[in-house]
Amino acid sequence: MDQKTFDKYVLNTYTRQPITIVKGQGMAVWDDKGREYLDFFPGFGAGNMGHCHPKVVEAIQKQVTEIIHVPNVYYNNAQGELAKLIIENTFDGQVFFCNSGAEANEGAIKLVRKRNPNKKTIITLKDSFHGRTIAAVTATGQPVYHDGFDPLPGGFEYCEANNVEMLKSMMNEHVAALMFEPVLGEGGIVPITVEFMAAARQLCDDYDTLLVLDEVQTGIGRTGKLFAYQHFDVEPDVLTMAKSLGGGIPIGAFSVKREYCDILKPGSHGSTFGGNPIACSAGIAVLNAIADENLLENALKMGNYLKEKLEALKSKYSIIKEVRGIGLMLGMELTIPGAEIVQQCLKKKVLLNCTHKTVLRLMPAINVTKFKIDKVIKVIEEAINTQLAWGQQL
């Protein structure tokens, strides 16, 4: 289908790049004209394993020949096995499955609100992102995502990231939960500090408040740990996840510590397709591949290597303000809008992303190699030089 016909029938809610992707393998994708691209932001954060990982493909193919969907009024082995894997690799509790990060966060919001009738306020962070459904978008601390959707649900307040004193001033006995990402993704790749994370946990303990960590983007090995909270000496009470958990298949989930598992009862929450056997089989394959292929170690090692290369660029170009992030979730903040750099890289067959207007977001597959990193760094530097030369001509 040509892009003009596509645009005629598909609602225009995305700013699309002018390429039609038809195939992917590893870190490479191909368009409908046969051109190959190096994808350094696969699946918008949902491609931690790269495209079409062989073990994920095999698991999906096997499951689809057996049964495609099982309603949640019956038992489903794949769902149970994936839940067991998640709990064994995090903290004791139970898991609810859905289809996306927004749904996972909505479920977490329902759980913390239902726990205590006198605790309804949820504190999130400014510049956060939690999804586009009505409660999740209200939890998102960016007014641009709220515009036009009023009246929004009440009960949400927003704290500055890493501002411990502000957080302390906002806490009271009516706060049901603190909810935030260990690294703000859409907010510009801003890691939460050790001090803020520790204070959040302590304040939750002091006020009988639940700590909800949104690991939709930071989870599944992205930061060099299976979940980013594992870099801190802290455990959440509720953990949300999605994106890369399915290796490209839609899936979402939230896990809850054992002591809070009886809050949601039959009929209080549900999802028709949540825990679908195909999605859960893919999730099992993803977690097993991460362990079998030592991908957490690779994410840490390659994350350090990529960060060093970005810091080297920063030392050469004054338009690079800061490099930040954890593992292979890195951002390079510029003093100029990043969209044109992304376009220059696209022309050179490298796919990148710009978030928060000036932050280049680099989140390659966690099995990335030094060779691929070097290639992308070269292209980014060429794009910067092109942009600088263009600016001098104005």
Map each language-model feature to its residues.
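Conserved N-terminal phosphate-binding loop of PLP-dependent enzymes in the Aspartate aminotransferase
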Residues: 1-394
